[in-house]
């Protein structure tokens, strides 16, 4: 059995630790920070807003917040990070100054009205391009009034932007979503002194009476990154894998539960229960069966491209529905998955809110065909999750990915670890 510490810190927690430090009064320490491009964007923006960032050890930082958020003299560049743009929008909505947030072409084409509308419910002064649909975003910080908001989508980024505004508003605000999204923001902020209460699925957020408490966070491994190697184990005969030190928040392990329903042997071993549950995940290869994914989409939406690869190895037709938000990610992930599968000759079809895949069960005929004829180049669409999902498929098929380097956005060690897995020499180092 292979034991693997993927050394890929959780992206969600890394972003939040940096952003929340700006609401503290004293220096904060973040250990095992994810040095991916997205999280580094959040760190750079914190510096541009006046925070002092010191590198104290490998992947660890001491962040000293400014006495007051500084109005930057330049655009705040979020690059490809939607989390940075959406959470900073909530934070800056009540801060004195003019703030412009922009990103690369991909980010500036992703939907931003989903955060502008709830922030405007506070009477925040925020504008976006094309009638508030897209970035760049312009924010003129101003006093906020408390509000009650019911979100039409389950999105941790929307919820987090709302909470960050609500903490700075005049009076208590409430937020409701139709399905529980990731709850790291609520957990972290409550541990730092924020008054956030869950009343039968409705969040009540009271304004901060004092700055957040200083913190010293050590960030666990990202379950979304770990899932790529759970997938690798699930599609590789006779494989057994132990993933170490993984964040096991129940809102983040939906993909592991789906893979378990498909037939893979998966067990969890909780190691600690401090701020968040952290532990090990044991995976063993087994024949896979088809699955229909239609509920609790928020708990696995980032992993659906990887799950589509598992569906390819399953017996029967697998279906994904109610996942329209996949079209609003770094790429249109429904189109990306289906177009690549069709190029490989896989029976599949896309819907407005999902797709279906006819599992091959036996992939050897496809492998034999590609050994005689060069397979088509897999298009990553410059989307890290599409690139990594199809890279795992190269364990079974001789494929090439057009831009695997985009994995550096969230998982800089991915390519090296996958190559070691292919060679059978993966030792967790």
Swiss-Prot record:
What domain of life is recorded for the organism?
Bacteria
Which top EC class is named for this enzyme in its record? transferase
GO CC terms of this entry: cytoplasm
Does the UniProt entry include the keyword DNA repair? no
NCBIfam families on file = aroA (TIGR01356)
Pfam families from the UniProt entry:
EPSP_synthase
Q: How does it assemble?
A: Monomer.
Which HAMAP family does the record match to this protein? EPSP_synth
Say yes or no: keyword Signal present. Answer: no
Catalytic positions are: 302 (proton acceptor)
Report the protein's function. Answer: Catalyzes the transfer of the enolpyruvyl moiety of phosphoenolpyruvate (PEP) to the 5-hydroxyl of shikimate-3-phosphate (S3P) to produce enolpyruvyl shikimate-3-phosphate and inorganic phosphate.
**Any one Gene Ontology molecular-function term assigned to this protein's record:** 3-phosphoshikimate 1-carboxyvinyltransferase activity
Q: Lineage from the top down?
A: Bacteria, Pseudomonadati, Campylobacterota, Epsilonproteobacteria, Campylobacterales
The gene coding this protein: aroA
Cite the binding residues for 3-phosphoshikimate: 11-12, 16, 155, 157, 302, 329
Q: List the catalytic activities from the record.
A: 3-phosphoshikimate + phosphoenolpyruvate = 5-O-(1-carboxyvinyl)-3-phosphoshikimate + phosphate
The alphabetized UniProt keywords are: Amino-acid biosynthesis, Aromatic amino acid biosynthesis, Cytoplasm, Transferase
Which residues are recorded as binding phosphoenolpyruvate? Answer: 11, 82, 110, 157, 333, 385
Primary site of residence: cytoplasm
Q: What is this protein called?
A: 3-phosphoshikimate 1-carboxyvinyltransferase
Organism equals: Helicobacter pylori (strain P12)
Subcellular location per UniProt equals: Cytoplasm
Report the EC code(s) recorded for this entry: 2.5.1.19
């Amino acid at each position: 059995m292979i034991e693997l510490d993927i050394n890929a810190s959780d992206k969600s927690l890394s972003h939040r630790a940096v952003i929340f430090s700006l609401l503290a009064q004293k220096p904060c320490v973040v250990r095992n920070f994810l040095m991916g491009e997205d999280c580094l964007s959040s760190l750079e923006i914190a510096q541009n807003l006046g925070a002092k960032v010191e590198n104290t050890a490998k992947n660890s930082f001491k962040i000293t917040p400014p006495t007051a958020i500084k109005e930057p003299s330049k655009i705040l560049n979020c690059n490809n990070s939607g989390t940075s743009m959406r959470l900073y929008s909530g934070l800056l909505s009540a801060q004195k100054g003019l703030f412009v947030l922009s990103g690369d072409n991909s980010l500036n084409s992703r939907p931003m009205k989903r955060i502008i509308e709830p922030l405007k419910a506070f009477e925040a002064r925020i504008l976006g391009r094309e009638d508030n649909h897209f970035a760049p975003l312009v924010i003129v910080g101003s006093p906020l009034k408390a509000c009650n908001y019911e979100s039409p989508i389950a999105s941790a980024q929307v919820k987090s932007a709302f909470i960050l505004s609500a903490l700075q508003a005049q009076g208590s605000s409430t937020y409701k979503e139709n399905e529980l999204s990731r709850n790291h923001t609520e957990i972290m902020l409550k541990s730092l002194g924020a008054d956030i209460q869950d009343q039968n699925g409705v969040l009540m957020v009271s304004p901060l009476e004092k700055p957040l408490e200083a913190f010293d966070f050590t960030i666990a491994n990202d379950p979304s990154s770990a899932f790529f190697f759970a997938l690798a184990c699930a599609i590789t005969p006779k494989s057994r894998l132990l993933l170490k030190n993984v964040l096991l928040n129940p809102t983040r392990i939906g993909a592991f539960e789906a893979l378990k329903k498909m037939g893979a042997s998966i067990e969890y071993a909780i190691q600690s229960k401090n701020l968040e549950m952290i532990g090990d995940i044991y995976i063993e290869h087994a024949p896979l069966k088809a699955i229909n994914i239609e509920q609790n989409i928020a708990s696995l939406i980032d992993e659906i491209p990887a799950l589509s690869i598992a569906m390819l190895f399953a017996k029967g037709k697998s279906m994904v529905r109610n996942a329209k938000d996949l079209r609003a990610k770094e790429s249109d992930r429904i189109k990306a998955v289906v177009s690549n599968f069709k190029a490989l000759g896989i029976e599949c079809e896309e819907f407005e809110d999902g797709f279906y895949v006819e599992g091959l069960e036996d992939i050897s005929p496809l492998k034999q065909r590609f050994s005689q004829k060069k397979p088509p180049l897999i298009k990553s669409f410059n989307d890290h999750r599409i690139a990594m999902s199809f890279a795992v498929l190269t364990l079974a098929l001789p494929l090439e990915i057009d831009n695997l380097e985009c994995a550096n956005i969230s998982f800089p060690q991915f390519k090296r670890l996958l190559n070691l897995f292919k060679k059978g020499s993966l030792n967790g180092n």
